[in-house]
């Protein structure tokens, strides 16, 4: 994309042009240097849209819940963006891309924008590409952006650092509730959502989790909420959305967005450092090092010195 065309695309994106958004997202996805594109956008636009992260284990019903949230928010005339990060094969890189199928009923709605992409094997649920695309979509005139991450469960921390509100979705009978608590999840989520409340074991799972949360000491006096619902429970899902809205509004006043921006800056620094290492073929040259004869620290110090 040429410079003038890029500037025009950014201007059109800022003006609310969906085609320009789609075009810019594709350009970011395929670019060798996506971070520079995101920076060009952020030089001319601010992140104004709250990002809601939805993570959880496989089979928890994340996509179905988001689909229900979209229906409720659309009845309120809200504009919604969705990034559905699907699991990808670590060998082939192929993505299941099943999440978008569950949301197909909204595909003809011009106030709903859904983007599916592969995780590229990122265990934390948020690949580098999805991180950048989330930031791009947050400058568009959506009222909410939902980012559904890979449901692997080893690390939900990626999305919680980017999102203004993070939901851990659990399903009854999957045996994952205690494991979730052991994983330090209290430190990184705002809402634990027991899905599929129409199942008989859901009540037991809910009370079990509630007992764990009540006994646990959440960091920094963080108020973690636990709720129970299912995709067809419009009343409860509306209550959940109201809760999210209230927390996001409060956290904005308390400066949580600043924390998110600081993380954004750190990510940019990491990406730029990595690019320098790649461009200067420093990583490639490591293959020539004799690690048996040199201290690793010596090699690292020399690389840092060469970069100065």
Language-model features: locations:
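Inter-motif core of Ras-like GTPase G domains
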Residues: 139, 155-173, 183-193
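Conserved ATPase-coupling elements of RecA-like P-loop NTPase cores
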Residues: 126, 153-159, 177-179, 201-205
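Long, well-ordered amphipathic alpha-helical subdomains in the mid-to-C-terminal portions
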Residues: 228, 239-308
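Conserved nucleotide-binding/hydrolysis micro-motifs of P-loop NTPases
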Residues: 87-90, 119-120, 151-153, 173-176, ...
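Walker A/P-loop
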Residues: 63
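Canonical P-loop GTPase G-domain recognition
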Residues: 191, 197-250
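Nucleotide-state-sensitive switch-loop elements of NTP-binding domains
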Residues: 5-52, 57-60, 71-155, 165-168
């Amino acid at each position: 994309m040429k410079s003038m065309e890029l500037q025009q695309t950014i201007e059109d994106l800022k003006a609310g042009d969906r085609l320009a958004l789609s075009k810019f997202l594709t350009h970011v996805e395929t670019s060798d240097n996506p971070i520079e594109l995101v920076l060009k956008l952020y030089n001319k636009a601010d992140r104004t849209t709250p990002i809601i992260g939805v993570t959880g284990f496989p089979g928890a019903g994340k996509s179905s819940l988001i689909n229900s949230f979209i229906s409720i928010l659309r009845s309120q005339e809200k504009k919604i963006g969705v990034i559905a990060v699907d699991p990808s094969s670590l060998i082939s890189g192929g993505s299941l891309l099943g999440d978008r199928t569950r949301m197909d009923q909204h595909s003809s709605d011009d106030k709903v924008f859904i983007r599916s992409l592969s995780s590229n094997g990122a265990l934390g649920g948020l690949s580098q590409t999805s991180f950048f695309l989330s930031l791009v979509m947050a400058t568009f005139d959506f009222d909410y952006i939902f980012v559904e991450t890979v449901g692997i469960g080893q690390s939900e921390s990626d999305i919680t650092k980017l999102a203004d509100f993070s939901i851990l979705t659990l399903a009854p009978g999957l045996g994952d509730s205690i494991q979730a608590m052991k994983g330090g999840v209290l430190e990184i989520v705002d809402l634990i959502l027991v899905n599929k409340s129409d199942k008989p074991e859901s009540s037991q799972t809910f009370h079990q989790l509630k007992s764990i949360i009540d006994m646990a000491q959440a960091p920094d006096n963080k108020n973690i909420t636990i709720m129970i619902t299912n995709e067809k429970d419009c009343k409860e899902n509306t209550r959940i959305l109201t809760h999210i809205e209230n927390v996001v509004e409060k956290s904005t006043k308390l400066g949580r967005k600043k924390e998110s921006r600081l993380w954004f800056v750190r990510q940019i620094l990491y990406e730029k450092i990595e690019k320098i290492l790649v461009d200067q073929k420093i990583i490639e040259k490591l293959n020539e090092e004799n690690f048996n004869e040199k201290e690793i620290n010596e090699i690292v110090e020399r690389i840092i010195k060469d970069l100065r």
